[in-house]
């Protein structure tokens, strides 16, 4: 690890997010969704999927964090030492978001993966769709606050900070890189649901992957060690 260049360390963030994308699809593809069908319970569609999918998603969410942590440390060091952004408010917002992501990304996979397992158990025990969805929503209420806060702090803060730093030319990246953030890419992902429900899974993580890819390729040289 010590022999790795700064670019290689930052690229570990892309590896981490690639693992997260796989976990996202295991969690979201063909499971829960929204519908206009008047017969659907609370406008929710739900399907039983194998428990192993959620177990593997949790493992991937947990396993990707060490790689992401290494990438975060290196990227923040580059921004502080090479680009002198330590005192910038936008950078501080960016730093908070990335530090928060180390915990939040593991939580989102482990915490949310419990919900479809509860649904599966409900369907197995009762065979009643409405009752099973109700049980799932009850469990969801216990994690909705930290989930919402994590989303705001991580995805919200990093998007605002990234767009601000790019617009102010604080980083040597082109304006086209503005879109390389989790919120914009997640919004693009919503369009995928018109093709198939759940196809938007992984687009938030893809936004993070693109952000780290841009930073790895543009902020440091190939063999540079900051």
Feature map (PLM): residue ranges:
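Hydrophobic, aromatic-enriched alpha-helical segments typical of multi-pass transmembrane helices
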Residues: 1-226
């Amino acid at each position: 690890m010590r022999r790795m260049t700064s670019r290689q360390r930052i690229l570990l963030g892309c590896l981490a997010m690639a693992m997260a994308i796989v976990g996202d699809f295991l969690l979201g593809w063909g499971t829960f969704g929204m519908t206009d069908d008047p017969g659907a319970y609370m406008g929710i569609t739900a399907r039983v999927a194998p428990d192993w999918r959620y177990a593997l998603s949790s493992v991937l969410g947990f396993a990707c964090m060490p790689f992401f942590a290494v990438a975060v440390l290196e990227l923040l060091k580059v921004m502080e030492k090479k680009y002198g952004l330590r005192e910038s408010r936008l950078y501080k917002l960016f730093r908070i978001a990335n530090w928060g992501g180390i915990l939040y990304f593991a939580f989102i996979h482990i915490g949310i993966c419990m919900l479809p397992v509860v649904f599966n158990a409900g369907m197995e025990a009762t065979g009643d769709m409405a009752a099973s969805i109700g049980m799932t929503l009850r469990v969801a209420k216990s994690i909705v606050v930290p989930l919402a806060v994590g989303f705001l702090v991580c995805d919200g803060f990093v998007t605002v900070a990234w767009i601000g730093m790019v617009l102010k030319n604080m980083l040597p990246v082109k304006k086209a890189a503005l879109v390389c953030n989790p919120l914009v890419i997640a919004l693009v992902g919503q369009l995928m649901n018109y093709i198939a429900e759940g196809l938007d899974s992984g687009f938030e993580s893809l936004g993070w992957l693109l952000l780290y890819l841009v930073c790895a390729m543009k902020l440091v040289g190939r063999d540079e060690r900051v």
